Amino acid sequence: MTHLMTMTRHASKLLAAAFLAVLMALTMAIMPVFAQGTAERVPASTAEISLTFAPLVRQASPAVVNVYTEKNVTQRGMTLEQMMFGVAPQSRVQNSLGSGVIVGAYGIIVTNNHVIQGADTFRVVLSDRREYAAELLLGDERTDLAVLRINTEGLPLPVLPYADTRDTQVGDLVLAIGNPFGVGQTVTNGIISATARTDVGINDYSFFIQTDAAVNPGNSGGALVNTRGELVGVNTAIFSRTGGSVGIGFAIPSEMVKRVVDAAVNGGTFVRPWLGLAGQSVSFDIAKAQGLDRPIGVMVTEVYPGGPAERAGLRRGDLVTAIDGREVFDEKGLKFLAAIRNPGEQARLSILRGGKAQAINVRVEPPPGATEADVVLLTNGSVFNGARVIELSPRLAEENGLDPFTRGSGIYVHSVTRGTISRNYFRPGDIIRSVNGKQTKTVKELQAVLKANTRDWDIEIERNGRIVRGTVRT
């Protein structure tokens, strides 16, 4: 019995030793494989240790240019010395600079309108330092975009293709390319901070892409580029208390840029499409009443008689939540999404009516009414002599940032001739409401009133949103 127990203990020790040997062998076999998967390795090239935008910059930067302008300013009036010695008033040249983007291979360049506004001559310098004189095809103050053309003598230029900003998301990497402070072409990087900023107060189609890429004076008109080398937008403005970049820049989206460029190339006039409605943003209380879990959309407050919205069946009280699948949150966003369509195209509006979702197709079209060709020069001997006037209409309102629902409520002062009596009393933008107690809804009505043989004129006008009344004796 004792011998048997001794043999059993001996066998157990042998089995344990054998098991331990097998386990160690397996461990040694596995360890090299595990080590090979986790061992650190010296990078074989700089591409493996650096994140670089260099290939993207090489692709995109040749399509970004410097824009220089000159304006001849003549001294107004004469000094005493000039009068005594017969010296003519002196003139001087004002220079300004900005950036631009080549969007057409044969010399079509887009920039900001405020870069070229009022200038007499334009000069474009390419990234390879070639210089060209440029001509202005279109300058649109309300979109703050302008289109220049240079003569390349048939030589194609590098072009930035337009991005579809419907695919742009907050957090996307972008590059800002331009000529800040005139130091030369400069590239900064950042991300998309917001995609639909409407409270910027720069133009009437406020719908901006916000970025934290450094943008400074001189960057205006330059490119905001995505990682595919596409033009996301034209850098336009910054928010700053010091004049320098604080990481809040704004770019006009590529859809609006393309619309203005196409208009410039195809005729030189940017026609603003119109829906024929007015609305207000939705508050939290209105959203709750509509059965929404968050404020979204524009509540229709007015529908222009006979306009596109009325013909399509929209009514006051309808809640427009989206255009072509893109959500809207205020009237500016609504106007922008309509304006990026060509006149005559259909826009699909998603609406809520009585708590029920519907879709309505609206044909966007130019607003009706008088154009620049309908401006009338008043030449009688009255206080209005020298004033150029035109009847209020939706088209005039859209072109001048007025309320398009003011039809038939006055005569718009388009301009005033220098050296005439009207220049003493009227300014461009005034709205003539009544003369000598008679309302003036049409130019013919105003002309009829002005035929009266009188020297006293009781006038009521609207100026900058305020009613001004007064009596003028001639």
Regions found by a protein language model. Name each.
Residues 17-32:
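Bacterial N-terminal signal peptides
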Residues 34-346, 352-357, 363-385, 390-395, ...:
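Serine-dependent protease modules
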Residues 272-279, 346-366, 385-388, 423-428, ...:
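Intrinsically disordered, Ser/Thr/Pro/Gly-rich linkers and terminal tails that flank
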Residues 291, 403, 447-450:
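Short proline/glycine-enriched turn/loop segments at secondary-structure junctions
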Residues 385-432:
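C-terminal accessory/binding modules appended to enzymatic or scaffolding proteins
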